Amino acid sequence: MRNDFFKCTALAATLGLLLFATFYSPIAAQDLPKGELEIFAWWSGDEGPALDALIKLFESRHPQVEVINATVTDGSGINAKTVLNTRMLGGNPPDSFQVHAGQELIGTWVRSERMEDLTALFQSQGWIEAFPSDLIQLIGTDDGIWSVPVNIHRSNLLWYVPANLKKWGVTPPTSWEAFFKIAPKLRAQGVKPLALATNWTASHLWESVALAVLGPDQWSALWKGNLDWTSEAMISVWQVFNGILEYTNDDAPSLSWQQAIDMVVNGQAAFNIMGDWAAAYMRTTLKLRPGRDFGWLASPGTGGQFMFLADSFGLPQGAPNRGAALAWLTVLGSREGSDTFNALNGSISARLDSDLSKYNAYSKTAARDFKRDRIVGSLAHGVVANEGFKNDFASVMAMFLKNRNPHKAAQAGETIAIKNGIIR
C-alpha cells in the first residue's frame, strides 16, 4: 500500500510541478511576498517562545511581510478550533492555521474541500524524502498532501520526580498491575498516586490505558472498524480506566494540565500522564533539569510503543495572502525552521535529518524511541479519528466520569463510532 501511495504521489507531484511554476512562484527569491500573513495557532504560554522563534526566523527571510499572530490560548486547541470553525465556515479563513495532522484535518476541512493540495510544494522542497513515509501517508490522501508537519509529540508518557519516589519508597510502574500495587502505599503516605486535570486530560489518560490493555494491533484495528467497541477487550479498557480513577484527585475538573504537573513537582502526587509538552513546561517555566529534577517513562503497559501526534499547518482555499502563506509553510518544513521550533518546544522534528545536538536530554530519547518503537496514532490529539468523533467522545467521557459504568461507556463508544463512519 505504501508503494502504491508513493507512485500516486510521484505522479501527482510531477504533474503538479507545472502548476507550481505558475501558482507557487511567491517562494522564489525574485518574487518575495509582501503585505501581511495571518497565522492561527493555539501555541501560547510555555510553547509561546518556540512559536515566537519561528516567526522571527520567517521575518528574517521575509522582512516585507507583517506577521499577524492570531493565537487563541488554551491547552489542546479546543477554543482555537471553535474560532477557526466560525471563520472557515464564514468564508473568512486565516492564511494558515495550526491543526493536528491526520484525521482532524482530513476528516474535516479536506473532506469539505476547503484546503489546497501541497503536493507540488513537498516535491519542490525535497520533503517527500525528508519526512518519514508513514507520516507522509498520514497527512495525505489519494488526492494530495494537505499540511506541513512541524513536530512530533509523544502522548503516552508517565512523569515523576525521582527524588520524591525515592523518599516514598516506590519505583515508576511499567504496567498498570504494578501501579495498582504501589498506589495504596502512596495513598497511605498522603500522596495522590496519579494527578489528573480537566476532562480532555481524562481522554488523554484513557488512550494510554486503552493502548496498554489492547496492544498496538487491536488499538489500530479499533480505528479501522475491525474491533467491536462492545467487545470484552473494550469493556476491560473501561474497567481498568475506572480502577485508575480511584487513585486520582477529586478536584481534577478544575485544574489545568500544568497544575496537574505542579502536583507532581510539589510532591502532592506521584505521577502524571501527559504528552511531552510537559517536558517543555518543566524545563522552561519551572526551570527543572530533564533526567535529574524530573523523569519519564512510557505510560504503564506501553513500553516499546510510541503514541504520537503531529502539529501541522495547511493552506486554506481562499487564503487572503496566499503567497505569504506558502512562504510560511516553506520555512516550517525546512530543517532550520524545524530545529528552531522543536529545540525550544520540547517536541522533536518530523524531519529525518534534524540536528539532535540542539535538543535536550528528553528530546534525544524521544528521537531515539521514535525511530525504534512501534508507532501508533493518538485519539485525543486528532490522529486516528475525525473531529466529529473526538467531540462525541468528549461527551462519552463526561458521562463516564459521572456514572462510572464501563458497559454503558462501551455501548456509547460503538454508537459514536457508527455515527462518525468508523464502523460502516
Identify the role of each PLM range:
Residues I106-R111, D134-T174, T198-L222, M307-G314, ...:
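Periplasmic solute-binding protein
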Residues P26-R111, Q125, P172, P253, ...:
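Conserved N-terminal structural module of periplasmic/extracytoplasmic solute-binding proteins
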Residues W42, I55, T108, L205, ...:
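Extracytoplasmic/periplasmic substrate-binding proteins
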Residues R87, P94-D95, Q125-A163, K192-P193, ...:
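A structural signal for short loop-to-beta-strand junctions that line the ligand-binding cleft
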Residues H100-S155, F180, G291, A361:
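Hinge/lid segment of periplasmic solute-binding proteins
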Residues S60-R61, E66, G90, W168, ...:
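Extracytoplasmic/periplasmic substrate-recognition and gating elements
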